[in-house]
Amino acid sequence: MSQEIAVVGSPEFTTGFRLAGVRKFENIPDDEKDERLDDAVERTLDDEGTGIIVMHTDDLDHLSRGTREAVEGSIEPVLVTLGGSGAGSGGLRDQIKRAIGIDLMEEDD
């Protein structure tokens, strides 16, 4: 079964992905994230047709502890965060390591 990319976030964040052909998205206006973001992320996690969830790094702060732990620990679908500059923006290397369990860029001494 083929899986798709899903984007969760503000309309401004999801628009570029939609224009690029991403069909699965959850638009949550900034002023409603505290109330609605958990439900949107949980729906996306439960969707068997989704293989990758894309979110803005800053949006993780709006998630409840349980939802945040679920999405960060999920292997399928895997979470990819973009943007932001906080401590939680560990980069693509850490996201790949978390998703597959090994560090592909580890250097041998």
Curated annotation (Swiss-Prot):
Record-annotated disulphide pairs: none
Main location: membrane
Biological process annotations from GO: proton motive force-driven plasma membrane ATP synthesis
UniProtKB keywords: ATP synthesis, Cell membrane, Hydrogen ion transport, Ion transport, Membrane, Transport
The keyword Repeat belongs to this UniProt entry's keyword annotation: no
GO annotation, cellular component aspect: plasma membrane
Record bears the keyword Transport: yes
Subunit structure and binding partners: Has multiple subunits with at least A(3), B(3), C, D, E, F, H, I and proteolipid K(x).
Official protein name in the record: A-type ATP synthase subunit F
Originating organism: Halorubrum lacusprofundi (strain ATCC 49239 / DSM 5036 / JCM 8891 / ACAM 34)
Lineage, uppermost ranks: Archaea, Methanobacteriati, Methanobacteriota, Stenosarchaea group, Halobacteria
Encoding gene per record: atpF
